[in-house]
Amino acid sequence: MSNVLPKGVFDIFPYVTNSKNLWRNSFLWKTVEHAAHRICNLYGFDEIRTPVFEKTETFLRVGEHSDIVKKEVYTFLDKKGRSLTLRPEGTAAVVRALLDHSADMRKDNKIYYILPMFRYERQQSGRYRQHHQFGLEAIGVRHPLRDAEVLSLLWDFYAAVGLKHMQIQVNFLGGRKTRARYDEALREFFRKDLDKLSTLSQERFHANLLRILDSKEPEDQAFIEQAPSILDYVDDQDLNYFDSVLAELKVLGIPYKINPRLVRGLDYYTDLVFEAVTVVGDHSYALGGGGRYDELVAQSGGPAMPAFGFGVGLERVIQTLLEQGAALPTAPRRLRLIPMDESADAFCFSWAKHLRHLGVATEVDWAHKKPKTALKDAADQQVGFVCFVGEQELSTKQFIVKDMSLHQSFSGAQQDVEQRLVYEVQNA
């Protein structure tokens, strides 16, 4: 049986060797996820795990005119007719969780997650209907240094996994007054050429004007380039905030570029927005993004609380790492015990358990293969060490361990071999 998965989903699998699908290797995923956990812990952020599905109304708050709500969600009715939606993004779910646990909510909530998201997106390279997101939400504090701190965390994550040629592109959308002034200017600008815009941008003109700037349609690009810049409509107080964040990025050595056409696909963003991109020649593509959303908590029924966050698509991160030729992590070196016949089975079972208690990852090949076949299988499966156990080893308690990567062997009494294995594992 093959090819039975629905479109847009994939397995993260431990035995992937095909170079085309190497990005699906589970150890590679585990390494990237571990880096995210480690960096978040260093910055004092705590993990949250929200349900895979929630009431549909939870996600309507991201904006009724956003692409997610209009056409990308997996929504269904349960057996009692209640509308439920598979989680399409993390921020609304985190805000809902904080409000549900309001008695435990802090003045400064520092939350992160690594979770699958679900969107019914058009099939194309790098886009999946179930994708995995590393996200972070800092809810409760509005300060330029908080924004810079979150961007620093994201930058440290990219550095930890080995991404190169990264840049932060930033824009400032301002608050309600700024947006109102800018919307008026933008509407006036696009109105005179409305019939020349793409069908999608004509729809956005009436429903979500700012998203025209996010259009990728060829017929829109010349108009977008000539459109007014929102930075010309930001008041002095907001501009000082923006400048303070940029000054701190400069201190941190994080390369950035002001992109006045940058908008985000969700309606809740205010003030600072950004995308983290990898730059290749004259082209760039996003590996993450986010911004400030100071009104969403109140819109969700909670108190007025400022917030700043981001989301990173792990599929794109891992694929880009491979495209950039990053040094791939190696799996922990395991020992494979190979009993030569049934008489050695009980000993291997007991010894494997003891070795695991010592911290040596150990498995047993119970198939009683011929030595040549067993060695070939171990090599193909990238096993670190191999030890055959037969009648002679059982009687003398002397063992030979083959290092499969160095093509060398070491031998000795059982306790000596154990000490050497512990050393090799700890110093791998």
Curated annotation (Swiss-Prot):
GO terms for molecular function: ATP binding; histidine-tRNA ligase activity. Gene3D superfamilies: Anticodon-binding domain (3.40.50.800), Bira Bifunctional Protein, Domain 2 (3.30.930.10). Keywords: Aminoacyl-tRNA synthetase, ATP-binding, Cytoplasm, Ligase, Nucleotide-binding, Protein biosynthesis. It holds the Pfam family HGTP_anticodon. Its main location: cytoplasm. Its EC number is 6.1.1.21. Belongs to the class-II aminoacyl-tRNA synthetase family. It catalyses: tRNA(His) + L-histidine + ATP = L-histidyl-tRNA(His) + AMP + diphosphate + H(+). It comes from Chlamydia muridarum (strain MoPn / Nigg). GO terms for cellular component: cytoplasm. The lineage of its organism: Bacteria, Pseudomonadati, Chlamydiota, Chlamydiia, Chlamydiales. One of its GO terms (biological process) is histidyl-tRNA aminoacylation. The gene is hisS. Homodimer. NCBIfam families: hisS (TIGR00442). It is found in: Cytoplasm. It comes from the Bacteria. InterPro entries: aa-tRNA-synth_II (IPR006195), aa-tRNA-synth_II/BPL/LPL (IPR045864), Anticodon-bd (IPR004154), Anticodon-bd_dom_sf (IPR036621), His-tRNA-ligase (IPR015807), HisRS-like_core (IPR041715), HisRS/HisZ (IPR004516). This is Histidine--tRNA ligase.
